[in-house]
């Protein structure tokens, strides 16, 4: 986190309409600089100068995906990490098609999704209702399989998060269920992973693990402060924690297990 705050990475967020404000505020809180550029007239230029690119298909359109692919290729040429959040993949054929297109045409550094979304990328049967994926599977094994199949770093989020590059497998147990009651927390996590990847581009597993642990600790601390008040207070306090949390405190509270 100190690296993020010191370097103030520019994160090009091609994210969905529902979460743009929350994503921008969350990235500002951790010390990154968000920019939202969607037009095909400028996405390549913006992706080239940004420190990382987030592609999120929460509110997809054909034109939007065309712009995402242009931006992704530009980020690849510039050597900038691309984070892909396949929101709701598995729910409709359209989301399946555009996810395949992005993965086929863009060199994605990290894929982040819930178990249902990651299973859908592998063509496995799951249940995706809206953007909430539910599947009966070993999340850790799913993560390892997906990383091997997609040949990239995969983050599977859930009660316990998992990160793998196909060889290493790490579990992160931090977090709180109230995150699922605030729209946009999963999408913001993609942006936070992008910020960490921007300052640790050669250690993407470590970047993802540290981002997850930091994010989860912030959620736990926010819950402890607001559990008698409710979700609205939790959301505000969570943003405060993102801005106030130190590496030292997060390190003391993180629950990370290296599985292999």
UniProtKB/Swiss-Prot annotation:
<dbReference type="Pfam" id="PF02110">
    <property type="entry name" value="HK"/>
</dbReference>
<keyword id="KW-0784">Thiamine biosynthesis</keyword>
<dbReference type="InterPro" id="IPR029056">
    <property type="entry name" value="Ribokinase-like"/>
</dbReference>
<keyword id="KW-0547">Nucleotide-binding</keyword>
<feature type="binding site">
    <location>
        <position position="112"/>
    </location>
    <ligand>
        <name>ATP</name>
    </ligand>
</feature>
<dbReference type="GO" id="GO:0000287">
    <property type="term" value="F:magnesium ion binding"/>
</dbReference>
<keyword id="KW-0460">Magnesium</keyword>
<feature type="binding site">
    <location>
        <position position="36"/>
    </location>
    <ligand>
        <name>substrate</name>
    </ligand>
</feature>
<comment type="similarity">
    <text>Belongs to the Thz kinase family.</text>
</comment>
<keyword id="KW-0418">Kinase</keyword>
<dbReference type="GO" id="GO:0009228">
    <property type="term" value="P:thiamine biosynthetic process"/>
</dbReference>
<dbReference type="GO" id="GO:0009229">
    <property type="term" value="P:thiamine diphosphate biosynthetic process"/>
</dbReference>
<feature type="binding site">
    <location>
        <position position="157"/>
    </location>
    <ligand>
        <name>ATP</name>
    </ligand>
</feature>
<comment type="pathway">
    <text>Cofactor biosynthesis; thiamine diphosphate biosynthesis; 4-methyl-5-(2-phosphoethyl)-thiazole from 5-(2-hydroxyethyl)-4-methylthiazole: step 1/1.</text>
</comment>
<keyword id="KW-0808">Transferase</keyword>
<dbReference type="GO" id="GO:0005524">
    <property type="term" value="F:ATP binding"/>
</dbReference>
<comment type="function">
    <text>Catalyzes the phosphorylation of the hydroxyl group of 4-methyl-5-beta-hydroxyethylthiazole (THZ).</text>
</comment>
<keyword id="KW-0479">Metal-binding</keyword>
<feature type="binding site">
    <location>
        <position position="184"/>
    </location>
    <ligand>
        <name>substrate</name>
    </ligand>
</feature>
<dbReference type="GO" id="GO:0004417">
    <property type="term" value="F:hydroxyethylthiazole kinase activity"/>
</dbReference>
<protein>
    <recommendedName>
        <fullName>Hydroxyethylthiazole kinase</fullName>
        <ecNumber>2.7.1.50</ecNumber>
    </recommendedName>
</protein>
<keyword id="KW-0067">ATP-binding</keyword>
<dbReference type="InterPro" id="IPR000417">
    <property type="entry name" value="Hyethyz_kinase"/>
</dbReference>
């Amino acid at each position: 986190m100190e690296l993020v705050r010191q370097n103030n990475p520019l994160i090009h967020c091609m994210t969905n309409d529902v979460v743009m404000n929350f994503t921008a505020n969350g990235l500002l809180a951790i010390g990154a600089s968000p920019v939202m550029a969607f037009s095909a007239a400028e996405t390549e230029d913006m992706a080239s100068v940004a420190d990382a690119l987030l592609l999120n298909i929460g509110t997809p359109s054909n034109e939007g995906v065309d712009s995402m692919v242009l931006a992704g290729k530009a980020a690849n040429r510039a050597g900038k990490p691309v984070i892909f959040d396949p929101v709701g993949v598995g729910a409709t054929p359209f989301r399946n098609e555009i996810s395949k297109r992005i993965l086929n045409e863009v060199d994605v550094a990290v894929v982040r999704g819930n178990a249902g979304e990651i299973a859908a990328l592998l063509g496995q049967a799951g249940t995706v209702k809206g953007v909430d994926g539910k599947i009966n599977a070993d999340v850790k094994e799913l993560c390892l399989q997906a990383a091997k199949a997609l040949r990239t770093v995969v983050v599977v989020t859930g009660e316990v998060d998992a990160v793998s590059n196909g060889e290493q497998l790490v579990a992160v147990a931090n977090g709180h269920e109230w995150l699922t009651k605030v729209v946009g927390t999963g999408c913001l996590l993609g942006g936070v992973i992008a910020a960490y990847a921007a300052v640790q581009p050669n250690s993407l597993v470590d970047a993802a693990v540290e981002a997850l642990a930091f994010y989860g600790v912030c959620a736990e601390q926010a819950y402890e402060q607001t559990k008698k008040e409710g979700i609205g207070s939790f959301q505000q306090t969570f943003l405060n924690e993102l801005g106030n949390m130190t590496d030292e405190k997060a390190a003391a509270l993180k629950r990370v297990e290296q599985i292999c």
